[in-house]
UniProtKB/Swiss-Prot annotation:
Cofactors that this protein relies on: [4Fe-4S] cluster
Enzyme Commission numbers on file: 1.17.7.4
Protein name per UniProt: 4-hydroxy-3-methylbut-2-enyl diphosphate reductase
PANTHER family on file: 4-HYDROXY-3-METHYLBUT-2-ENYL DIPHOSPHATE REDUCTASE
Cofactor remark: Binds 1 [4Fe-4S] cluster per subunit.
């Protein structure tokens, strides 16, 4: 599934590498697309509309999205973030985060008579449905993802007797299956495409009949942001990724930048976290942001770089995203 239209990259390349621009103008390469994806936009708006409709406090299980600024802003507005449903007063309103939850969490909420709104990204829900479908057909499901991530816990919880977590290529040797003719891989939606394909290749060496998911599990936005970073990284002395450390897709962007040729790459939540020493001798800085990052945080980094002489900002556009997800049915009438 994709909402992306391929576009020209449009980087004005130097004759040599970015480092050879020492006598030229400092510049910023600004990745497009970046920032909010459709699932994050839907999740954040779900909480905002729930506040408007029901008033504070409302409760959210885990972080609605993995971004410190978003969570802090919503907390200031009266949202209470909890780890588990037993922390929510009986009968209160609880929103499930964009990362999805297992059936056991739904059951726990119902047992406490909680009113619930599900802000799970529809692309995560798709993976849940795949897990249920292949479990019904008695497949061994190899779920590629990061141990402890909420999305992985939710997906695995749909079919705990059939799902095995595969946390990267190094985990492949420990995988065991019952019937090598009935094995399928699924994945967390926010992984590095390249590393996931490495893991799949290793799995296929062990299990030649390994089936692919019916459609891409890594979401369009994750892929698009990685493609944009790959396009600009070879020209960059430095790539700054705006995002939080618990954001899987943001962390992956740092890895992608380094693997694609950037000389250095750092993850920051705010412009104030940019170390001026990072800019010593730098002529080309790439900027991108994770899928849960509001644009105001990117603008803060651009303004900071402008103060350090990086006045020339060139967009690097590799796709145009148009996808919009409907709000949960409880709130659709409230959307403007």
């Amino acid at each position: 599934m994709s909402s992306a239209v391929p576009l020209n990259v449009g980087i004005t390349r130097s004759a040599d590498s970015g480092a050879s621009r020492a006598d030229g103008e400092k510049r910023v390469l600004l990745a497009e697309p970046r920032g909010y994806c459709a699932g994050v936009d839907r999740a954040v708006e779900t909480v905002e509309k729930a506040l408007e409709k029901h008033g504070a406090p409302i409760y959210v299980r885990k972080e609605i999205v993995h971004n410190r600024h978003v969570v802090d802003t919503l907390t200031d507005q009266g949202v209470v973030f909890v780890d588990e449903t037993d922390e929510v007063p009986e009968g209160a309103l609880l929103v499930f985060s964009a990362h999805g939850v297992s059936p056991a969490v739904h059951e726990s909420a119902a047992a406490r008579n909680l009113r619930t709104i599900d802000a799970t990204c529809p692309l995560v829900t798709k993976v849940h449905q795949e897990a249920k479908r292949f479990a019904r057909d008695d497949f061994d499901i190899l779920l590629i993802g990061h141990e402890g991530h909420e999305e992985v816990e939710g997906t695995a919880g749909e079919a705990p007797d059939h799902v095995q977590l595969v946390d990267g290529p190094d985990s492949v040797d420990a995988v065991t299956v019952r019937d090598e003719s009935k094995v399928i891989w699924l994945s967390q939606t926010t992984l590095s495409v390249d590393e996931t394909m490495q893991t799949v290749a290793r799995l296929r060496e062990r299990f030649p009949n390994l089936q692919d998911p019916p459609s891409d599990d890594i979401c369009y936005a994750t892929q698009n942001r990685q493609v944009a970073v790959k396009a600009m990284a070879p020209e960059c002395d430095l790539v700054i990724v705006v995002g939080s450390r618990n954001s899987s897709n943001s962390v992956r962007l740092v890895e992608v930048a380094l693997n694609a040729g950037a000389k250095a790459s750092y993850l920051v939540d705010y412009a104030r976290e940019v170390d001026p020493a990072w800019l010593d001798g730098v002529r080309t800085v790439g900027i991108t942001s994770g899928a849960s990052v509001p644009e105001i945080l990117v603008r803060g980094v651009i303004d900071l770089l402008d103060e350090h002489g990086f006045h020339d900002v060139q967009p690097v556009t590799t796709a145009n995203e148009t996808l919009v997800f409907a709000l949960p049915r409880e709130l659709r009438a409230a959307r403007t």
